Amino acid sequence: MSRETGAVCRMCRRSGDKLFLKGDKCVTKCVFEKRPKAPGPQLGRPRRLSDRGQQLRHKQSIRWSYGMTERQFRRFFGLATAQPGVTGDNMMILLERRLDNVLFRLGFGTSRAQARQIVMHGHILVNGQKTDIPSYLVKEGQEITVRETSKATAYFKTLAENIEAKAIPGWLSLDRKTLSGKVISLPAAGDIDARFDAQTVVEYYSR
């Protein structure tokens, strides 16, 4: 399945929840708040979703939030299943370790989509090595920095002035002066967004 290319606001409406896929625009100009119902013709009272349908909707919400294709998402589920421990927690921890998500958490992008573009355009170094793969899984102790040539661009100059307001998760640290972050520890189950119940993903793929 290819990456979703349609209007991202429709994904929020289809999921029935505000996913903040457009970053700051979701605060100031939110289509979901005006039209929270699913897209398409509204023919009377909406049907009640089956348990399977609810699992699918929740699985899609997590997948869309992290900006992944179904194939990528299923691969991460396979990786989580192969690890010891709780599969749902394992999967969410893997998703949090993605480089594009780490940049988003550090405040380098207002959305994961923007953070993914920053990675793909070659602006980011991991332990001094250029890394342009958004799905790269960071490890404990690694340092994430912006290339010196990239710091001279208008985007990163503005970022350096405005990044102060971003709250950083406890498993990451940020040096705002140098625009560099560090993975202090790997994320734990308690660090995961409370909106996401990964157990529904496990149940969906296990049937």
UniProtKB/Swiss-Prot annotation:
GO process terms (BP): ribosomal small subunit biogenesis; translation
PROSITE patterns cross-referenced by the UniProt entry: RIBOSOMAL_S4 (PS00632), S4 (PS50889)
MF annotations from Gene Ontology: rRNA binding; structural constituent of ribosome
Keyword Membrane: no
Keyword vocabulary terms for this entry: Ribonucleoprotein, Ribosomal protein, RNA-binding, rRNA-binding
UniProt-listed Gene3D superfamilies: Ribosomal Protein S4 Delta 41, Chain A, domain 1, RNA-binding S4 domain
Gene Ontology cellular component terms for the protein in this record: small ribosomal subunit
Domain S4 RNA-binding: 97-163
A Pfam family reported for this protein in Swiss-Prot or TrEMBL: Ribosomal_S4
Keyword RNA-binding: yes
PANTHER family: 30S 40S RIBOSOMAL PROTEIN, SMALL RIBOSOMAL SUBUNIT PROTEIN US4M
Protein family: Belongs to the universal ribosomal protein uS4 family.
Function: One of the primary rRNA binding proteins, it binds directly to 16S rRNA where it nucleates assembly of the body of the 30S subunit. With S5 and S12 plays an important role in translational accuracy.
Summary of subunit composition and partner proteins: Part of the 30S ribosomal subunit. Contacts protein S5. The interaction surface between S4 and S5 is involved in control of translational fidelity.
Name of the protein this chain belongs to: Small ribosomal subunit protein uS4
Species per Swiss-Prot/TrEMBL record: Dehalococcoides mccartyi (strain ATCC BAA-2266 / KCTC 15142 / 195) (Dehalococcoides ethenogenes (strain 195))
Gene: rpsD
